[in-house]
Structures are given as structure tokens and as C-alpha cells.
Amino acid sequence: ADIEDIVVMAKITVVTGERADELVPSISAFSNNQNRIQVADFQTHSPFLRKVEELSRTIWARNPDGASLQTRWFFERTRGQYADEKSKGTRSQQDRFISEFPTRQKFSKTDLAKYENSWKGFPYLVSRGAQKNFIEFMAKLPQDSLWEIGDFHDHIAKQILFRQTDRIVLSQKYGGYKAQVVTYTVALIASEFKRDINLAHWWNQQKL
């Protein structure tokens, strides 16, 4: 078929580098009503999240299984990022990626907010749901907050605590209240025993 005379309308927004982080999320929020976009997606270009992503790609961790091969924790700044990276390259390259970034060590923006707010004593925010909790987490971040290596280590240690708590609670069969029991339990542990907890040790061992 001859499509020479077909005209396709397009709206193109040219954004300068200096304002990209500010404008791109707003464009996504206000112009796209046809695709389901989650609130957390609007923060994808946040400098804070970009820094967490950078750290997750450069920091090696001990293999909790005792193997000599070290691993990394994959922070998924954009949805589907892990699957996209895993599918790249040859089969051997894909296998190497999975060895380096095991699926169990993948976490998203909303996961990060859940672990941090549980530890900080805001389980009631976590209980409101992933998107609402993420909004509150980002709102409470100090302006220009950027994690360093030690902050990333501490966060992974908090993840390890949360995930272990989740497994224990799951075995107790709390049914539909599991999510609430887990976040409130982690908040209680942090509140009562924070001074005695050595996050660096958990990070070094990659387990409690």
C-alpha cells in the first residue's frame, strides 16, 4: 500500500539537560493518560534514585551461599530494567549476569521505600500501600540527599532483616495481615534494638 500521503501527528518536547530531571516526570504525568503509569514512575529521574542505581552497579557483596563468586544487588530504577538487562547478549553473557545479579537480590523503588520506612518507624505508611508509601518516603528525604557507599551497605542490611522477618511471618500463616505484621515487626526491632544492631556485620555476612 502507498503510504506516501499519510500524515502522522506528533508532539515533540525539547528539554534541555539542565531541566530534564525536573520536566520529564511532569510530562509523563500530565500527557500520558492511555498507559497505566504508577506514581513511583514519575520519580525515575530523581538524582537520589540515580545514585542508588549507580551504587548498585558498582558494589560487590559476599555470596551468602558461601561460594567464592561475589554478587551485586540490582536496584531497578525503572520497571522492567532487570529483565531487559538479563535478556541482553549471548546465552553465556546472560548466565553471567544472573550469577552477578541473582534474582533474589533485585529490588525496586517501592521496595526500597518499604524497607527504609519500616526501619525508620513508619510502618503505618508502609501499610498504606507501595505507591503511597513511596510518595511519603521521597517527600521525607532531605533536599539533595544522595547515598554514599556506607548508606547502601546499611540499606541492604535492612533489606536482609526485612526479608528474613517476612519469611518467618509467612511460616506463621497470618493470612491477609502478613504485610502489616512484617513492617510493624521490623519497626519494633529497629526501635527497641537499634543500638545493639550491627548493620555493617549483616552487610559483610549477607545474612543475620
Identify the meaning behind each predicted range.
Residues 2-208:
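Accessory terminal alpha-helical modules
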